[in-house]
Amino acid sequence: MAFLGAAIAAGLAAVAGAIAVAIIVKATIEGTTRQPELRGTLQTLMFIGVPLAEAVPIIAIVISLLILF
């Protein structure tokens, strides 16, 4: 049962991370399209936001590995 729980946690974490990154990149592209002069600022915020969005799934995967061992 622990294997199933770890697999579900890791899978959901991966999907959630991918969706979060897609939303951040989509918002950056839309913002750049609306105001091209803010491209540098939006890109900087994206480069900060993507690792923050990826941190939670990485922590969830580590916790799912801890469930196994």
Swiss-Prot record:
Single Gene Ontology MF annotation: lipid binding
Kinase among keywords: no
UniProt-listed CDD domains: ATP-synt_Fo_c_ATPE
Keywords, comma-separated and alphabetical: ATP synthesis, Cell membrane, CF(0), Hydrogen ion transport, Ion transport, Lipid-binding, Membrane, Transmembrane, Transmembrane helix, Transport
Alphabetized InterPro entries for the sequence: ATP_synth_csu_bac/chlpt, ATP_synth_F0_csu, ATP_synth_F0_csu_DDCD_BS, ATP_synth_F0_csu_sf, ATPase_proteolipid_c-like_dom, F/V-ATP_Csub_sf
Cell compartments where the protein resides: Cell membrane
GO cellular component: plasma membrane; proton-transporting ATP synthase complex; proton-transporting two-sector ATPase complex, proton-transporting domain
Site annotation Reversibly protonated during proton transport: residues: 54
Membrane topology: Multi-pass membrane protein
Transmembrane segments: 5-25, 47-67
Pfam families: ATP-synt_C (PF00137)
Assembly behavior: F-type ATPases have 2 components, F(1) - the catalytic core - and F(0) - the membrane proton channel. F(1) has five subunits: alpha(3), beta(3), gamma(1), delta(1), epsilon(1). F(0) has three main subunits: a(1), b(2) and c(10-14). The alpha and beta chains form an alternating ring which encloses part of the gamma chain. F(1) is attached to F(0) by a central stalk formed by the gamma and epsilon chains, while a peripheral stalk is formed by the delta and b chains.
Entry similarity comment: Belongs to the ATPase C chain family.
HAMAP family for this protein: ATP_synth_c_bact
Function: F(1)F(0) ATP synthase produces ATP from ADP in the presence of a proton or sodium gradient. F-type ATPases consist of two structural domains, F(1) containing the extramembraneous catalytic core and F(0) containing the membrane proton channel, linked together by a central stalk and a peripheral stalk. During catalysis, ATP synthesis in the catalytic domain of F(1) is coupled via a rotary mechanism of the central stalk subunits to proton translocation. Key component of the F(0) channel; it plays a direct role in translocation across the membrane. A homomeric c-ring of between 10-14 subunits forms the central stalk rotor element with the F(1) delta and epsilon subunits.
This protein's name: ATP synthase subunit c
Source species of the chain: Alkalihalophilus pseudofirmus (strain ATCC BAA-2126 / JCM 17055 / OF4) (Bacillus pseudofirmus)
Lineage: Bacteria, Bacillati, Bacillota, Bacilli, Bacillales
